[in-house]
Amino acid sequence: MKISIFCEGRLNKGLENELCNIYIKRTLSLKKSGILNLEIKNKPNKTNNSKNTKNLVLDEKGKNINTMDLVGMIKTLNNNRIESLNFYIGKPEGFSNNYEKYEKISLGKMTFPHSLARVILCEQIYRCATILTNHPYHKS
């Protein structure tokens, strides 16, 4: 499965970007997780509505999920041969109406800067990959 994180606005080249790159590299080293590609991009010109794609919007009012919920989602999507999982992180003002039809999830009740939300999401995807491959990183 290919996982993409689409972000509105600039992608800064600071410490947050370095951390994201570390987690991306670690995730891709765990081939048995089923995650074949993980990348961060600027917002696409159009949203992907393919039936082989799952789109999730990060929203403070979205469904609160935990790590094991995300693991279950990735496992189910892999089992159902879904090719792409897209996460969308918007601007502080929120999203346009183009994203209304997508499921909304939240990283928690706290508010994070968007650059830090990217890091947290990359770490959680890596954590999911370690759980799926029985790697000792995750301690439950």
Question: Can you say where each PLM-predicted feature lies in the sequence?
Answer:
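Short glycine-/polar-rich loops that comprise or flank the Walker A/P-loop
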Residues: M1, T53, K101-Y102
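Short, Lys/Arg-enriched, disordered terminal segments
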Residues: M1-I5, I82, K139-S140
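S-adenosyl-L-methionine/SAH cofactor-binding core of RNA-modifying enzymes
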Residues: S29-N86, G94
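Structured adenosyl-cofactor binding patch, chiefly the S-adenosyl-L-methionine
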Residues: N97-K139
